[in-house]
Amino acid sequence: MLSSKNIDDDFITLDSPRFLSHSDYIAENKRTTVSEGDLLMTIVGTIGRVAIVPKELKGICLQRSVAVIKPNKEIINNRYLMYQLQNMRSFLEKEARGVAQKGIYLKQVSQLDIKLPEIEQQKQIVKVLDKVSKLISLRKQQLAKLDELVKARFVEMFGTFPANPFRWSIGKIQDVVSDVRYGSSRPAVEGGKYPYLRMNNITYSGELDLRDTKQIDIPDSELDKCTVRRGDVLFNRTNSKELVGKTCVYNRDELMVLAGFVIRVRINERIRPEVLSAFLNMDFSKRMLIGMCKTAIGQANINAKELQNIDLYIPPIELQDQFVTLKNKIDQQKQTVQQSLEKLELLKKALMQEYFG
């Protein structure tokens, strides 16, 4: 059984599915049969992601966080409908209702107004959008390969942990830090004085993403405790279990206030921030973090004391500097690819606005 977490735009993953007994599967399949060419749309939590069921995906059923849409192929192309629904995401998010987790109803989906040109015109629109989407996908693959290159070079230079094949000095994170603090627990304020850096601004792969930031007002007396500066390591302490421990380096000079679900780590001369961040983002560390976090009310947590108690190796600083130089070069390549990706995404957005309004 798949959930909304398995549905991305034009892509379905089989990560962490829920398995059912044969009798439960029969009952669920009777309620909603999923067929090739159907559209799957997320309607709870992250709303409006839409993908098409491929031919090779058989025998699945869905949680109620996903709507199944069966297009009439005689009057509408399923990929045309997919793009049009994706273009409605902002509208659907505004229409969502709920307290703990917002969602939209199937009736709301069925009553959406859509543009319905002749089928041949739909195919032409799909052809254009597919071409741009393919280029976007290629850019994302390039970024993923560059991320994997950083990880591969990290292991090549330092080895895995706790295996520690090069027999580096072993310590704890508390041995390589000078200051560890939580961010502010104050709520975001529209039009606030300072930009507010939250857990969503740290990506799973360890990047700082400031495309969606909030603002906050905070007394001057509290600024030193919860603002970030260049070289700070930022650790996401509270999130879903698989996302706890997202870590990045703050590499800007802009004054920003840090939110409470993120820990600010200032390091000493024994380790470079890029090395500590890369260490915590390695697959072997992510497995360790999942194993040590505590879960309550749907959220997992690793506190500052637990973070500082994590074991790590401490390679020679000269070797760390070599890694930082290498990573900086790869980051420059990533920046070029990222800029191209953003231009393509803007183009796709403009085209969808032109086609669908």
Q: Model-predicted segments: where are they?
A:
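Non-catalytic DNA-recognition/assembly elements of restriction-modification systems
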Residues: 111-127, 141-182, 309, 314-321, ...
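A generic structural signal for short beta-strands and their flanking turns/coil linkers
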Residues: 16, 63-65, 193, 212, ...
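A short glycine-rich beta-alpha junction/loop motif
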Residues: 43, 59-67, 85, 98-120, ...
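Sequence-specific dsDNA recognition surfaces
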Residues: 6-36, 171-186, 200-232
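Contiguous mid-protein beta-loop-alpha structural module that forms a pocket-lining wall or clamp
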Residues: 135-138
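Short amphipathic alpha-helical signal-transduction/dimerization elements
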Residues: 85, 89, 93, 281-284, ...
